[in-house]
From Swiss-Prot:
Biological function: Alpha-conotoxins act on postsynaptic membranes, they bind to the nicotinic acetylcholine receptors (nAChR) and thus inhibit them. Has possibly a distinct nAChR binding mode from other alpha-conotoxins, due to a different three residue motif (lacks the Ser-Xaa-Pro motif).
Main location class: secreted
Expression across tissues: Expressed by the venom duct.
Domain notes: The cysteine framework is I (CC-C-C). Alpha4/7 pattern.
One GO molecular-function entry: toxin activity
Organism annotation: Conus pulicarius (Flea-bitten cone)
Name of the protein: Alpha-conotoxin-like Pu1.4
Classification of source organism: Eukaryota, Metazoa, Spiralia, Lophotrochozoa, Mollusca
Keywords, alphabetical: Acetylcholine receptor inhibiting toxin, Disulfide bond, Ion channel impairing toxin, Neurotoxin, Postsynaptic neurotoxin, Secreted, Signal, Toxin
Family listed: Belongs to the conotoxin A superfamily.
Protein origin, superkingdom: Eukaryota
Pro-peptide positions on chain: 17-35, 78-81
Length: 81
């Protein structure tokens, strides 16, 4: 009985591991991993549907850009004193 149990465990273990020999499945798996690289965060902020997912990042970027723009408008003087 114990031998039958070991055979069942061995059979289910072998069946549960995916085969790496099928190049078609490897190609499909590699395509799925590149899906997140379609949009950069900056491009995502420009798309309304994507912007909602990373709104905090977009708002922080806009606040930084506005602060940088305001800083660039300040008169710049070198003070020797």
């Amino acid at each position: 009985m114990f031998t039958v149990f070991l055979l069942v465990v061995l059979a289910t273990t072998v069946v549960s591991f995916p085969s790496d020999r099928d190049p078609a499945s490897n190609h499909e798996n590699s395509k799925g991993s590149n899906r997140n690289a379609w949009f950069t965060p900056e491009e995502c902020c420009a798309a309304p549907a994507c912007r909602g997912m990373i709104l905090e990042f977009c708002l922080a970027g806009e606040a930084f850009a506005a602060a940088l723009d305001g800083f660039r408008r300040l008169p710049y003087r070198l003070s020797s004193e």
